[in-house]
Amino acid sequence: MTVDSALRSPMMHSPSTKDVKALRFIEEMTRNVDFVQKKVIREILSRNSDTEYLKRFGLKGFTDRKTFKTKVPVVIYDDLKPEIQRIANGDRSMILSSYPITEFLTSSGTSAGERKLMPTIDEDMDRRQLLYSLLMPVMNLYVPGLDKGKALYFLFVKTESKTPGGLPARPVLTSYYKSEQFKRRPNDPYNVYTSPNEAILCPDSSQSMYTQMLCGLLMRHEVLRLGAVFASGLLRAIGFLQTNWKELADDISTGTLSSRISDPAIKESMSKILTKPDQELADFITSVCGQDNSWEGIITKIWPNTKYLDVIVTGAMAQYIPMLEYYSGGLPMACTMYASSESYFGINLKPMCKPSEVSYTIMPNMAYFEFLPHHEVPTEKSELVELADVEVGKEYELVITTYAGLNRYRVGDILQVTGFYNSAPQFKFVRRKNVLLSIESDKTDEAELQSAVENASLLLGEQGTRVIEYTSYAETKTIPGHYVIYWELLVKDQTNPPNDEVMARCCLEMEESLNSVYRQSRVADKSIGPLEIRVVKNGTFEELMDYAISRGASINQYKVPRCVSFTPIMELLDSRVVSTHFSPALPHWSPERRR
């Protein structure tokens, strides 16, 4: 087998001609990383040489990396906000890009609830489409026969807004699903969805979810893979099924669509799918989903031919792995690509690996990439590293320059180099930068907080209780301040929930899991008070998501913020608290442990 033995031969079955073309492209890109990067930055600087932004820094037509890096500063969003606001307000001069900005892609919500607007040009859609076209050729090397069935993917759009200057402002996936490239995509047996476009494109997420779930049930034997953008989205779909299975079964039993569906386009499309009663299927759903039955393994019970789950379970999404394993009966979870509102970055060349082993290979044609070494103690001036020159084992913050006019922009993702494929580095997503809890000199990042929650939740295992969702904030109104962690629990035995003693031990276990600076502040400095866990009612985090969506967040991109500070969110959480628990003792700390 050619094409470097089909990406070094995972299963050794022959790829199709179309797949071979895609695999050869991957080989070409990954063997010539530095050459491609030089070409990309030369193209970007040549095209955008007359922009106001690049003229400001005196590039004078130079297109080499050295001049660019010497003259153009590394920036964050706030540095570009004046230029972005001018474009949003209708200024059509060449501010950031020589090509017209056709829309803004909005970032997912932050703890403060503010959206960022990322400028986009028409041809960016082609770059995204190119990356999408590489996913199935790689997956086909590992999972044969995906052309013999369909994908049940829960995909959603959000009603877009307009900037004062009339440009669309919408999440990247809404932009993609509404594009002609998606709506008029050619027939591909490897990418057949159970959901009709009309359901995906419906702005009412409830009608969309209901229709997509109904289609998935009607075609349950054809489904070979289930997915959503994030792991939390797939769990939300399972939760929807738990709440609405009776109504769904009624539709199947009668062969008629629920009155909850009012969208004309959905009704028209479903008239061709829900064509007749199917009592046998309705009875099956009732028997499987009935309240007396366990929902463990529900995915494979309903969709028995499912080969894997297609969801992102890296970074903050890793905490959902146990719940997905529970509902799926241990199906593999595939993380296929790495992308953001700023740009699409790369793909996972081993998509069926364990979630803890996921690494993404950056495709050097997508943008110009630089890497800021990430230090525990920041240095005053760190030299940025080229894509081809990063070192295995080191952590970097991703910095990008895009065709649409982001120049040396700090994305905020912290990545660790895990190895190389040809000359292309492979990265593990570590965390978002500055997602922290801090009372004093302590700094707790997202990865540490997640690890602490996981360790503490092990104490609940004997009773079959799980932490299904969490967030946090730094309570500074008390003296001293302390960490507050909100937990939503799935209690197996409602007559025997975890008592205060168990929950207090969870508080202490979390503190034991935090870094030495935190423990020193607790023990020696007395500058941090006991950690507090507030247990909230079931459904609270669904309400939190609904609130975020009502304020403009995308259902596709929504992620539970792991640290909150926005007052209405805090008030919502506190209004749902059913019990509070504090750490009963000091965590262990000694000067010898400070490193």
Swiss-Prot record:
Keywords: Ligase. It is an enzyme of class 6 (ligase). The keyword Secreted does not apply. InterPro entries: GH3, GH3_C, GH3_M. GO terms for molecular function: indole-3-acetic acid amido synthetase activity. Induction: By auxin. Belongs to the IAA-amido conjugating enzyme family. This is Indole-3-acetic acid-amido synthetase GH3.3. The gene is GH3.3.
